[in-house]
Amino acid sequence: VMPVGRPFLEYVVSALADAGIGEVVIVVGPESGAALEHFTRAAPPVRTTIRFAVQDQPRGTADAVFAARDAVRNAPFLVLNADNYYPPAACRAAAEIGGNGLVAFEADALVRDAGMDTGRVLRFALVDIADDGTLRAIREKPAPDDPLAQRAERWVSMNLWSFTTDIFAACERVLPSARGELELQDAVTIAMRDLGQTFRVVRERSGVLDLSHRADVGVVKERLADVEPRP
């Protein structure tokens, strides 16, 4: 709930509400009472219903998604980072996928509309999109000479996903990565390779505000100055 005028999560949830999404599940750690306290006591939401799922240990993004399995009905659902502000139009595009899919953001738009420097953007994962608009692969931190990095249009994953409940079976199969974490990207790979799942990619030419670090507060606060969150 890092503040940028109002707690940042208010802006994130408000964008989802603007996109027509009324049910939100926030995954928290066992000691993370700040979000629970904020949304249940200090500032209850008016446009959404917020529930909480607990991830017992910070084992990675695939484990965080798996922790929410009991809170998700048997219908497609979105997964997104709580430290990113996605434009409502991008959230709406993700919701309209209606199955497995990913919203990919144009690298140049992240620089132009989100105030990120080019070097930072190119450290994000690049999306390899097949000719039919489906996901072929995601490349984490590609080398500068990688063909994806050399393309005129580069598409970046900012972790705005649409999933069916089949993703939970894939999350269960994930093994720790080189970083020792259970990565959501690996669950997606398993879903495609072993479970026969196809992921549609929606291209979005807009910025995503990233509040991963304290140093981001100034830029994010400036960009959200005219936004009044109404979660």
Positions of predicted regions on the chain:
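Conserved beta-strand scaffold positions in the cores of enzyme catalytic domains, especially
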Residues: 1, 52, 100-102, 201, ...
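Glycine-rich, basic loop-to-helix element that forms the pyrophosphate-binding segment
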Residues: 60-67
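Short, aromatic/basic amphipathic alpha-helical patches
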Residues: 36-44
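Conserved core of the sugar-phosphate nucleotidyltransferase
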Residues: 87-165, 169
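Conserved alpha/beta core of the MobA/IspD/sugar-nucleotide pyrophosphorylase nucleotidyltransferase superfamily
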Residues: 136-231
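N-terminal glycine-rich phosphate-binding loop and ensuing alpha1 helix
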Residues: 1-36, 48-50, 55
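Active-site acidic Asp-centered loop
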Residues: 80-82
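Short aromatic/hydrophobic "clamp" motif used to bind/position activated sugar donors
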Residues: 77
